[in-house]
A protein has these predicted regions:
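Flexible, processing/modification-adjacent segments and terminal tails
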Residues: 20-39, 45, 52-54, 82-84, ...
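Buried hydrophobic packing residues in well-ordered domains
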Residues: 30, 42, 76-77, 104, ...
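Gly/Pro-enriched, hydrophobic low-complexity segments
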Residues: 105-109, 121, 149-245
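Positively charged n-region of N-terminal signal peptides that target proteins for export
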Residues: 1-4
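Bacterial N-terminal signal peptides
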Residues: 6-15
């Protein structure tokens, strides 16, 4: 009888273990919260602060379309300030390009290069982390979220597997119950902390609760902060031609 009970208990434990999601599955679920599964556009507003005072701002329109393999291709159109209106950035596969209509030239960019404040070029492109990083579960712990509330989280350690990944490694904290992204720390190849980000202000956008703000704090100077706001989500068709470098001079938003 004891052996039967032990066998039954062992089966229960094995079943629970097999049902637990892997770190990679939790990362993919977190991606599904940050990003819609279909082609879409949204407005991205960047605001840079130094010691609590606004020093710069920029408004962009992002067009993102999922590609075979699950990653996104993104076209970014500069809207404000007026001096930058009409400029474009394109991320497709392992290439990123900047196009200036003034001189009608496109130049290759690094995703790691700063766009404004603490936001890099790669930060404004729509990216599924699960396609560029391998995840391992590092800890389960309670942290303070972007609303200064305690949150029980799984800490995932992400290591880059794609050559075009914006960061060498990332520590990502996701809500232990919902897989919502809560906090991230981004590291360079040298393991130097580049920035810390908090995902907050969850709202329903395109059928799911998604973070509509990301607060990015410099890794060396906590007084240097960039706020990214995401709004005006819209599901829409995005022609594949828009996502080709040769088409950039002919791009006209509809």
């Amino acid at each position: 009888m004891r052996s039967l009970s032990a066998l039954f208990l062992g089966c229960l434990i094995a079943g629970a273990t097999s049902a637990a999601p892997s770190a990679d599955e939790m990362l993919a679920a977190s991606d599904d919260i940050r990003n819609p599964s279909q082609a879409f556009s949204m407005t991205v507003t960047l605001t840079e602060f130094q010691a609590g005072k606004q020093v710069d701002a920029s408004t962009l329109t992002s067009y993102a379309r999922p590609q075979p393999g699950g990653q996104f291709a993104s076209l970014i159109r500069f809207v404000l300030p007026a001096r930058d209106a009409g400029k474009l950035m394109l991320k497709h596969g392992n290439e990123m390009w900047f196009y200036d209509p003034t001189n009608k030239a496109s130049v290759r960019l690094s995703p790691q290069q700063r766009l404004m404040g603490q936001a890099s070029n790669g930060d404004v492109a729509t990216v599924n982390f699960s396609r560029d990083y391998k995840a391992t579960l590092a800890a389960t712990e309670t942290i303070q979220d972007g609303e200064r509330q305690p949150r029980r989280t799984h800490k995932l350690a992400l290591s880059a597997t794609a050559p075009d990944a914006t960061y060498a490694s990332i520590d990502l904290w996701i809500d232990a119950d919902s897989n919502r992204p809560i906090k991230a720390r981004f590291f360079a190849d040298s393991e130097r902390l580049l920035k810390t980000a908090y995902y907050r202000r969850y709202q329903t956008q395109l059928g799911a609760q998604r973070p509509t703000e990301t607060v990015i704090i410099d890794g060396l100077d906590p007084q240097s902060v960039t706020l990214m706001r995401f709004s005006a989500y819209a599901a829409r068709a995005i022609p594949e031609a828009w996502l080709q470098r040769d088409f950039l001079p002919r791009f006209k938003p509809d």
